[in-house]
Design a protein with these regions (language model features):
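N-terminal amphipathic/basic leader segments beginning at the initiator methionine
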Residues: 1-19
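Structural motif
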Residues: 2, 51-54, 74-76, 99-101, ...
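Generic secondary-structure signature for well-ordered alpha-helical cores
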Residues: 9, 21-26, 45-48, 97, ...
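Conserved N-terminal alpha-helix of the aminotransferase class I/II PLP-enzyme fold
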Residues: 13-58, 79-81, 85-86, 91-93
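Membrane helical hairpin/interfacial module
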Residues: 62, 72-73, 77-80, 96-99
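Glycine-rich loop at the start of a catalytic domain that most often binds anionic cofactors/ligands
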Residues: 64-73, 91
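PLP-dependent aminotransferase-class I/II
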Residues: 96-142
Length: 143
């Protein structure tokens, strides 16, 4: 079985260590790491995109995605058990200045019915159905 939860729960095999030692290296910040460049090019090709970017963790990826789509003072709607809410040390608030509004879904999946229920519970404290009010967060992202 391959465990992809984290590199902290697996032990590299001898072959993996040898591959790491033999891999060509460079500075990925300056686009000089051939291994990272090849990975990004391959992923972009697989996904049919112009480019891809390698990020070192799922947490980093989540936070970059939130920050890309929001501004400080915004709100995101997420499932009440979302990883981004429970296991990222408040990164959404700390790094992006964004608050999370929780929705009751089923294993991270929620639909229009659950969103409507969440909105009804917050009325009139939501900007989803009302004009922007500087006292309320702007809903910008549904995760």
């Amino acid at each position: 079985m391959i465990d992809l939860r984290s590199d902290t729960v697996t032990i590299p095999t001898t072959e993996m260590r040898e591959a790491m030692a033999q891999a060509p290296v460079g500075d990925d910040v300056y686009g000089e790491d051939p291994t990272v460049n090849a990975l990004e090019e391959r992923v972009a090709e697989i996904l049919g995109k112009d480019a891809a970017i390698y990020m070192s963790s799922g947490t980093m990826t989540n936070q970059v995605a939130v920050r890309t789509h929001t501004e400080p003072g915004d709100e995101i709607l997420i499932d009440k058990n979302a990883h981004i809410y429970f296991y990222e040390a408040g990164g959404t608030a700390a790094l992006s200045g964004v608050m999370c509004s929780l929705i009751s879904g089923e294993r991270g999946v929620f639909g229009a019915k659950e969103m409507e229920a969440a909105i009804s519970e917050k009325e009139p404290h939501t900007t989803i159905l009302r004009p922007v009010d500087l006292h309320l967060p702007r809903t910008k992202l549904i995760c």
